[in-house]
C-alpha cells in the first residue's frame, strides 16, 4: 500500500515522503497512529501544493535576505564608549551592542546571533562585522568605535 508519511518513521522514511508499506503495517500501525495517510490522488495533490508553497516561501526569504545584504553592505555604525588614554575600552563591545546600534541608527532589526564579531573588540578603531542572513547569504558592514 502506498502511503504519505506525516512525520519521520524510523526504518521507513522521512516526513512528506511517499513510500510503499505492507498493507497490515499501514492499516494497523501507520494510519491509526496518524503517522501516515493513504496515497490517494487528492492527498498526493495536497502534498504537491504544500511543497510548492514551501518552495515559494523559501524563494521569498532568499530574495529578502539578498535585498537586506545589499542594504547592509554600505552601512557604517558608530558606537561611542568610554576608553582609557591608550585607546583601550573599559569592557568590550559585544554583538548585542552592535545589534542595538543597528536598530537605533539604521532602523534595521537584526538578531545578535546572526552577527559574527571579530574575536575581541576591546579598543577604539574600525572593525568589519559579518552578518549571516541566510545559509550562503552573508554581508559585512563597518563598526566604528570612538571615545566619548
Swiss-Prot record:
Transmembrane segments: none
CC per GO annotation: ribonucleoprotein complex; ribosome
UniProt entry keywords in alphabetical sequence: Ribonucleoprotein, Ribosomal protein, RNA-binding, rRNA-binding
Keyword Ribosomal protein: yes
A Gene Ontology molecular function term of the record: structural constituent of ribosome
InterPro entries linked: Ribosomal_bL9 (IPR000244), Ribosomal_bL9/RNase_H1_N (IPR009027), Ribosomal_bL9_bac/chp (IPR020594), Ribosomal_bL9_C (IPR020069), Ribosomal_bL9_C_sf (IPR036791), Ribosomal_bL9_N (IPR020070), Ribosomal_bL9_N_sf (IPR036935)
Gene Ontology terms describing biological process: translation
S-S bridge residues: none
Pfam families assigned: Ribosomal_L9_C, Ribosomal_L9_N
Matching HAMAP family: Ribosomal_bL9 (MF_00503)
Membership in a protein family: Belongs to the bacterial ribosomal protein bL9 family.
Role this protein plays: Binds to the 23S rRNA.
Protein name: Large ribosomal subunit protein bL9
Gene this chain is encoded by: rplI
Amino acid at each position: 500500500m502506498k502511503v504519505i508519511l506525516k512525520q519521520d518513521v524510523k526504518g521507513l522514511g522521512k516526513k512528506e515522503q511517499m513510500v510503499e508499506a505492507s498493507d497490515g503495517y499501514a492499516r494497523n500501525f501507520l494510519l491509526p497512529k496518524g503517522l501516515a495517510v493513504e496515497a490517494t490522488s487528492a492527498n498526493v495533490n495536497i502534498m504537491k501544493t504544500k511543497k510548492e508553497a514551501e518552495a515559494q516561501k523559501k524563494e521569498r526569504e532568499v530574495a529578502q535576505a539578498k535585498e537586506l545584504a545589499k542594504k547592509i553592505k554600505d552601512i557604517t555604525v558608530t558606537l561611542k564608549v568610554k576608553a582609557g588614554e591608550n585607546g583601550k575600552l573599559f569592557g568590550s563591545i559585544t554583538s548585542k551592542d552592535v545589534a542595538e546600534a543597528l536598530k537605533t541608527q539604521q532602523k534595521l532589526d537584526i538578531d545578535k546571533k546572526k552577527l559574527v564579531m571579530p574575536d575581541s573588540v576591546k579598543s577604539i578603531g574600525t572593525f568589519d562585522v559579518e552578518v549571516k542572513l541566510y545559509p550562503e547569504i552573508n554581508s559585512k558592514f563597518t563598526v566604528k568605535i570612538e571615545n566619548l
